[in-house]
Amino acid sequence: MERRQDDQPASAARKLTLLVVDDNQEVGESLAMLLEALGHHAVVVRNWQMAVEQVKLCVPDAVYLDIEMPGISGIEIGRRLRHNPETANAVLIAVTGHSLPMYMDDALAVGFRHFLVKPVRLEDLATTVQSVLAG
């Protein structure tokens, strides 16, 4: 029996392009593997310069940003992405090892939609992906 295209699950209908920015390669790769297990395409970069170059190649649907990185914070990268017309609509998701309210407040003030604490649970990632898909 042939399967019709509209019989596919809703999540398979749209494959998201997701950018992961984390200075820790293992953490970034792990996050990307989980996002890909959810059926989406994830690209990992290790610093803000690489993030800027990557968004020139392909504008992501969402950006998972480590909050504490050498040289520039994920909050500042998020602020810059918000002011760039090409990435102004990308969903920003903060990823950090800190659950202090000040980090969350700073992220939300810049326009981050979600705030995840490491280690990130698959269920929490799935929630962020569903939020991006819902618009």
In which residue ranges do the predicted regions lie?
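Non-catalytic signal-transmission and effector/linker regions of two-component phosphorelay proteins
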Residues: M1-L19, E123-G135
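Two-component/phosphorelay signaling modules centered on CheY-like receiver
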Residues: Q25-V43
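Short hydrophobic/Thr-rich beta-strand motif most characteristic of the beta2 strand and flanking loop
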Residues: G39-R46, Q54, L116
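Active-site beta3 strand of CheY-like receiver
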Residues: C58-Y64
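Active-site residues of response regulator receiver
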Residues: D66, T96
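The feature encodes the CheY-like receiver
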Residues: P70, L100
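Short, glycine/charged-rich "phosphate-handling" switch motifs in NTP-dependent
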Residues: R113
